[in-house]
Amino acid sequence: MHLPEDLVLEILSKVPAVSLARFRSTCRRWNALVVDGSFAKKHYAYGPRQYPIVIMLIEFRVYLVSIDLHGINNNNGAPSAKLTGQFSLKDPLSNSSEEVDIRNAFHCDGLLLCCTKDRRLVVWNPCSGETKWIQPRNSYKESDLYALGYDNRSSSYKILRMHPVGNPFHIESEVYDFASHSWRSVGVTTDFHIQTNESYGMNVKGTTYWFALSKDWWSSDDRRFLLSFDFSRERFQCLPLPADVKNLHLTVVLSVTREEQQLCMFATLGAGNVYKLDVFVATKTEETTGELTWTKFRRFHSKICINVSADHEKKVLVPHHILLPYYNILHIVGEDIYIRQVNKDGDIGCPILLTYVPSLVQIQQGI
């Protein structure tokens, strides 16, 4: 049965973006519609509300993770989590169907900025399959730090690349602008070092945040602070941590709430195998200064140290972006501690978890 194209468009526009990603491989006609710019706009306007999902980077591949929280909500037991699918990124340099080895990934508005194992850089929409390979001015380095953000003034996506030179406090930064399709330098900084073991960068409404260490960390009472980069102004800013987050906190992690996209901070403090987890939410951002107003949301007591993201409505914490060497354990925290293993055969290496909002947003490709 051959349906009229306008009816097919109407039906597909109401299908969740992550489901459309699966349909693309089953029908060439549907695939052509999904990658069309006019359909992307229609889906954004009339499609179902997109909620964040959890994706996991295991053995250089991106997997979808399904988290069942019914056990918490109904008091029927522990929640569960399992791998339910995979986003595949084909290597354009391969003559076969070989996939790209993804070493790290960063999320913004449904797009993933991926660093490959062989030091290439690609922006990828897993739902539409669209990609854009970003060429360097010289070459990419393994020590490079990246962030993907959006310039609200020019309505264009941008990539920030930070390259430490000589020592971790001497950082050369440059921005790739999707509007001009070129790199340009944004200067050199010598005042801070981004702590990559704690912070991979969290993008909230056009600004990316990290935890950073001041240059005089050995003599300063405020040696750790929040570093932000505004993609519209293309500038860094140093922001203070909440008053309750002292330097003696063992680990500080950033995340973002589901509904209102508010920045969250998780600070752990512990001795032995018992930890306290303090959750802070940025309730206000000063437009002129960029400073944040923090509210302490809750404190949890745990026997493990974890990185999580918040679901305020269900009072549940779900992991956001966490490095777990040698383990594939997914932690879900509610009123108590629950642990369930994500089943996958073989050696998983070092998995990375992050929340992802499915979208059909298009990538500016250039001429």
Curated annotation (Swiss-Prot):
Signal peptide start and end residues: none
PROSITE patterns registered for this protein in UniProt: FBOX
Protein known as: Putative F-box protein At3g21120
Cystine residue pairs: none
InterPro entries per record: F-box-assoc_dom_typ1 (IPR006527), F-box-assoc_interact_dom (IPR017451), F-box-like_dom_sf (IPR036047), F-box_dom (IPR001810), SCF_F-box_component (IPR050796)
Domain F-box: 1-43
Species of the source: Arabidopsis thaliana (Mouse-ear cress)
Domain of life from the UniProt record: Eukaryota
